[in-house]
Curated annotation (Swiss-Prot):
Keywords, comma-separated and alphabetical: Glycoprotein, Host endoplasmic reticulum, Host membrane, Host-virus interaction, Membrane, Transmembrane, Transmembrane helix, Viral immunoevasion
Regions crossing the membrane: 363-383
Species annotation: Human herpesvirus 7 (strain JI)
Post-translational modification: N-glycosylated.
Any GO CC annotation of this UniProt entry: membrane
Protein name: U21 glycoprotein
Encoding gene, per UniProt annotation: U21
Phylogenetic classification of the source organism: Viruses, Duplodnaviria, Heunggongvirae, Peploviricota, Herviviricetes
Family membership: Belongs to the herpesviridae U21 family.
Length: 430
């Protein structure tokens, strides 16, 4: 009983921490395939109007991302934040080297301020680890375009046996001491980064499975298993779309949910979401703000960012509006959740499925009866044909006694007349 209480209390608040940062997991069999992938996605952003620098992180196992968030807000689970920001070697090394030094060094801050060509600029790092490959990409970019403008450095582990380290440098004309400092530091630390990637992969795989086994409450497992970035094709969704903002409702594990997505370059840093629900009160209709049950940001390797928020539809037949806001420009986009009754649609779908099943069974029975009838008719016709073939010679061949044939043959040899044919009984009667 006490064990259940000890587990349930931290899970409800999303603070299921291990007592220590996970060390090398040697007693756990990692049955990883080529498709298994660990993704660390860390970025630094700074608005030109202030001196505050924010850094964020994404930690994902293959396509099941269990943490989206930044250092200031609790997104998804504190457990994921704890692992991402404190325990993993590659993340901690690059995070400390880039972000912590930026906060402390005035010279680097001045250099970084020169990047502020627009409202906000970024330094973006992507770390991909797997048992068979490692991939680290470092990019500096600004809001004026999706493609990197100043620096793009890529490290790729080409051959695991001899640890061939392939580097792609694209400085685009920038002669920056800090750029070369990053390059030389990561180059000298290539073996450490390779080993750290493999170690981090094993650790994350182990602790993710262990955490899922401990998180017994419904909402905890729901958050861990849900990823709106990967939409199942066989899942029926009812949505309203905008160029940048969309609002959809569907069922997830038997629960009615709605997800609002804000799509665009950099929205994970400067975007915000808000969902309002129309309620009736004694003074008329009012709009009430609805808190998200789960939120997050997604930064793909290529393409636009996605900021999403999920709510449970406890009161379905009401009006929900999602507002996607660009905090830099103040631009807002509002979309309304489709007015669709999922229960009614499910009942109609069930009844239609029953009708389709009955129709299928009826057609199958008709086809089976037709097949049996055709086989019977074919068998009867075959038997009738065989009978006719067997009786045909008996109907057309005349039967003569052997003695008469011999006498007639003898008479013909000696020039005598053959015996007269016997008249039939009918002719004799006439």
């Amino acid at each position: 009983m006490w064990t259940i209480l000890l587990f349930c209390v931290p899970v409800i608040y999303g603070e299921l921490y291990p007592d220590f940062c996970p060390l090398a997991v040697v007693d756990f069999d990692v049955n990883a395939t080529v498709d298994d992938l660990l993704l660390f996605d860390i970025s630094l952003s700074k608005q030109c109007s202030d001196d505050k620098i924010r850094h964020s992180a994404v930690a994902a196992m293959t396509d099941n991302a269990f943490f989206f968030g930044n250092s200031e807000t609790q997104i998804e689970t504190d457990f994921g934040k704890y692992l991402a920001f404190n325990c993993y070697q590659v993340f901690s090394t690059l995070n400390h080297f880039l972000f912590k030094n930026f906060k402390k060094t005035k010279g680097l801050m001045k250099r970084y301020d020169k990047l502020c060509l627009d409202v906000e600029s970024y330094i973006h790092i992507q770390i991909i680890c797997s048992p068979f490959k490692s991939f680290i990409r470092l990019r500096r970019m600004n809001e004026t375009g999706i493609s990197p403008r100043i620096l793009e450095t890529t490290f790729y582990l080409q051959n695991k046996r001899n640890s061939t380290w392939v580097a792609i440098k694209n400085y685009l004309g920038e002669d920056d001491p800090f750029t070369y400092r990053i390059w030389h530091t990561l180059t000298h630390a290539k073996n450490f980064l390779i080993n750290s990637c493999e170690n981090d992969f094993n650790q994350l795989f182990f602790w993710q499975r262990k955490y899922l086994s401990l998180a017994k409450t419904f909402e905890a497992t729901f958050k861990q298993g849900f990823n709106p970035m990967i939409e199942q094709r066989n899942e029926q969704r009812y949505r309203t779309n905008n160029i940048d903002c969309s609002f959809s409702k569907f069922r997830q594990n038997g629960v009615k949910v709605a997800v609002c997505k804000y799509t665009g370059w950099g929205v994970s840093g400067f975007g915000s979401l808000e969902v309002l629900q129309k309620i009736k009160s004694p003074f008329g209709e009012e709009w009430k703000r609805v808190g998200f049950n789960s939120t997050g940001a997604f930064t793909p390797l290529y393409g636009s960012d996605v900021l999403w928020g999920l709510i449970f539809l406890r009161v379905e037949m009401t009006t929900y509006v999602c507002t996607c806001t660009n905090k830099n420009t103040g631009t807002q986009i509002q979309v309304t959740l489709p007015d669709v009754d999922l229960d009614l649609l499910d009942s109609e779908k069930t009844s239609s499925n029953v009708f389709v099943d009955m129709l299928c069974y009826t057609l199958i029975a008709i086809l089976f009866l037709a097949f049996v009838t055709a086989v019977v008719l074919l068998g009867v016709s075959c038997l009738d044909g065989v009978q006719k073939v067997l009786t045909w010679p008996l109907q057309h061949i005349q039967k003569e006694p052997v003695s008469e044939k011999i006498i007639n043959l003898t008479n013909l040899m000696f020039g005598q007349e053959p015996l007269p044919k016997k008249e039939s009984l009918k002719q004799q009667c006439l």
